[in-house]
Amino acid sequence: MKTKIVTTFLLILLLGIAVKGQEKVTSPEFLKYTNSKWVDSVMKSLTPKERIGQLMFVAAYSNKGIEHEKEILETIQKWNIGGLVFFQGDPVTQVKQMNSYQKQAKTPLLGAIDAEWGLGMRLDSTISYPYQMALGAIQNNNLIYKIGTEVARQIKNTGLHLNFAPVADVNNNPDNPVINYRSFGEDKYKVAQKSIAYMQGMQNAGLLTTAKHFPGHGDTNTDSHYKLPQINHSLERLNNLELYPFKELINAGLNGVMVAHLNIPALDASEKPSTLSKAIVTDLLQNKLGFSGLIITDAMRMKGVTNNNKPGIVDKEAVQAGNDVLELTQNVAKAITEIENAVKNNSILQADIDNRVRKILAAKQWAGLHNYKPTPNKNLVHNLNNANAKLLKRQLVEASLTVLKNDDDVVPLQKLDTLNIMSISIGDSLTTKFQETLGLYDNVKHFNIGNDINPATIDKLKKAINNHNLILLGIHDSSAFPKNKISFSNTLLKFIEGLPFNKTVVTYFKNPYSIAKIKNIENAKSLILTYQDSKTTQDIAAQLIFGGASANGKLPVSIGSKFKAGAGLTTAKKIRFKYTLPEDAGLNSKTLNSGIDSLIQQAISNKAIPGAQVLIAKNGKVVLHKAYGTHTYSDTTKVKLSNVYDIASVTKISSALPALMHLQDANKFSTEKTIDDYLPYFKGSNKAGIPFREILTHQAGFSPWIPYWQNTLRKNGSYKWHTIKRDSSARFPIKITSNMWLNRNYKKKVFKAIKKSPVSDVKKYKYSGLVFYLLPTIVEEITSTNFVDYINANFYDKLGATTLTYNPEQKFSHSKIIPTENDFLFRHSTIHGTVHDEGAAMMGGISANAGLFSNANDLAKLMQMYLDMGTYGNEEFISKNTLKQYTSVQFPDNNNHRGIGFDKPYLIYKGENSNTAKDASKESFGHTGFTGTMVWMDPKENVLFVFLSNRVTPTRENRILYKLNTRTKIQQVIYDAIK
């Protein structure tokens, strides 16, 4: 008795602080319906026993089959329970079940779910958003509000009305076995702010909420699912810390509070769990803190409350303590009987039961159950996973990324040409999404280790480490709670701890507390936290490293003595491609994807192309990156994003042209100079004296092309002995095919043919590729450097464009290279691994007319550099003025629509005969390629389009792609999606 008096006195002292805040308390909005006509009518229809039934919420599963459904229906019909709490299953079945249950219920059921991080916590085929600890790192609480509104939308669309969230516990115990990553962190103010944002987002979207686990479960070493935890903190500490977020939430209009199963002597000296404590539920929560909303017990089947309490009796005591809803009672019949008996003997007043039932019914009316309609399930999964819902997840992940170290601002990576990068993913023996995304930016050598490592692997890795100057280490620890032993073997742990951290960027994909268990990790060149391991976190973390994303998250908890809460560095803004969803750049996913997919499938089904790659970017954000179809019509191998295509004449703007612009910036080249200024061989020819500005805009009067290859053949079709041999030799070193080797001096014949070719006196637009055979030599003459070495060093290596290359079979296997034509005239074989253009082939595969191979992604990097007026990856390649000059129409008065090297839209749009989509701006520029390729950039909309195909397989005579206008129609879809 004395103990009880002392406890009450202490609570009064606590009230001294709490009562002052009561003026700020905002009553839950649903309480306005407590005495509504609908609530009155329902109350009149209920017997005393049925009213008690309204306090009961029963567990329901949509994956347990028909017997479970029958059991739930029987419980609903027999006891008129107040609600259901849904757990594992799938959304469509859940909706069907809930509709069925509602149909059988006398009183509409309140549907609840424990979906702290979204429906994915319970249901398959739905989105799991970041854990609250990850959200705790986010600096913009508007995003927390947004997740609240989105989670509310999804939950309501599955027929439910109440979410047991947010978790308002302040997690200040790294070994907490049950809350931990479910908390917003250890700072009570931030926990309160984020809890309120999450709560308001849900409530403003029409969903009931429940803050938990009152009065605070953040500092326990015991999981209340298995045992009753005890919290021995003082009343002052509890009031100042654990209770703070709950008080703020109550003041902000919180709907509901979930009471935890805790033993807290400072609040109740008895050994009762807090759920059964009147001192905590009634005196503290209701009377002292002024909370008038729904009070819900934590699950009444948890051992923290059942170990020392019998079914039925424990439920009665929970009601006596002041709870409104008994969540997951063990035995509904016993619970109702015990409560009914307590009412009869006046240990529970009927008026108290009625008040609680009115409160529950008021919540139901607020949720719309007074006008119940079945929940539709048509297109439900698609609706739950719509583009905006997916984008929000990505936004939350990016905003949560926390960089704890970043020596020398190593992240984002700069100067890719100076880096030799390897990645090691630990905890996953297969290539991870993290590694796949790293590979989008540069050539990264990947290694994977499971949870253990053997000596042979250690030796192999040590050799690789010595040969690389940067290690990207991804740690995928499967242990969710740091109290558990880290999932790696001691041998592997020692290997990690012995890594040369001074050249290692570490990304930790799990609970941040666990970092404390890895020695020396604080010495990493850079240390990045993602808080959990998923494909999305892996993807965006990799983008962060290369500058496709940025970080400004702050650590929400302290990690031992290594890093304190609030730590976190801000990295530079985006400097390279961001791979994301269309909505992130203001495009409509459905319009974009369905429109392009359908056009590509039309092209494939009409045999215009066997397959393709398409990449679309807006504002430097890659919003579509897809591979379609097969390598050829006869080869069913699927096209991958890593496959490389012969880009044909797109080479014209991808090799020598950027080199010339670069040299112009260095005052080593000018478009006003002539061929003979750089190649004296052409002095005195009909090509002398013609400025490059005219030549590169195709109005110099040059012949369109020269069939150089025909000079290698006799009249009977055999090769002239001095031109081509079946085997290579010192005299015949130039590979055409595996059994065709060209004379080393044939390049001179090509130059001679160009020199002697006619030049028209009429200076009008006439497409010619002749000069592009000369440009590599001109670059070499100016720079005294091998042409390929020059463009690699000054462009491709810096861009990370690792597949943008000449002679791809020198770097890649044939399985990675897409074939082109089955050539019956010259090469008498399928062209695979060498350039399709005969002239380029006779130049050793190296020409500015054709010859380059690439995948869409690497080619897009060069094109994005153009679109960004000469910069990419925080480096300037070409000056803005030079790029503007080259991408502008030079001779419009001469009816010439071309830029310098670049193609431009026709001066007058010609409908289906135009070279671009109708909505492409006059500022746009690009090029097409004979093999079925196209790149196009539009500065007005900041849009980039890359299309790669091999329409020339099996023959160049296949012109269906042109007839279908597939490329320009796809381009128009982009503009339609922007609209």
Regions found by a protein language model. Give the residues of each.
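Short, gly/Ser/Thr-rich active-site loops of penicillin-recognizing serine hydrolases
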Residues: I353-R358, A362-H370, P374, F447-I453, ...
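Short active-site loop at a secondary-structure junction
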Residues: G595, N606-Q613, S634-I695, S757-V771, ...
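Bacterial Sec-dependent N-terminal signal peptides
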Residues: M1-V25
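Preference for extracellular/luminal or secreted protein segments
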Residues: G21-V58, S62-E74, N287, N309-N588
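Hydrophobic faces of well-ordered beta-strands that scaffold small-molecule active sites
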Residues: G53-A60, G82-F86, L109-A115, N163-P166, ...
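Second-shell residues forming the walls of enzyme active-site clefts
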Residues: T47, Q94-L109, L119-M121, E186-D352, ...
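Short, conserved catalytic-motif segment at the N-terminal edge
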Residues: G586-I647, K668-S670, T830, D837, ...
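Short, surface-exposed loop or secondary-structure junction motifs
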Residues: K687-K922
